[in-house]
Amino acid sequence: MSTTTKSDYLLLFRGNVWDRGLSPAQLQKVVSDWMAWFERLKAEGKCAGGHPLEDEGKVVSGKQRTVADGPFAESKEAIAGYFFLTVADENEAIEIAKQCPGLEYGSIVEVRPVADISSVRQRAEKYSRGELAGGKA
């Protein structure tokens, strides 16, 4: 019996202006290609889910829990959506990212490994023992 370890990755789709200047027919093709890609990855057991995000939201920050508008949709760096992948390794996640139909139109796909919760616990334990100072390892 073979045991294969799988890893979790997020594909973060950046840029909300990729569709500017597309004709309705071009836009429909991209959306159809995108949905077919998503459904194929789900059928292969590689994508557990994902969603587009609304263009704008709120940002909560700081000790005072300040709420501000943003991030702003016009940014090429704004996160437009995500997929949650379970794949063999980072190389497979990157190969999947390269298949994104939006790349041809200016989208950016960021591939990020999902941290194991135990690494967060280990970091907290190091803080409590004084092994980490100033928030840096």
PLM features: what roles do these ranges have?
Residues 1-137:
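Conserved, structured core segments of small domains
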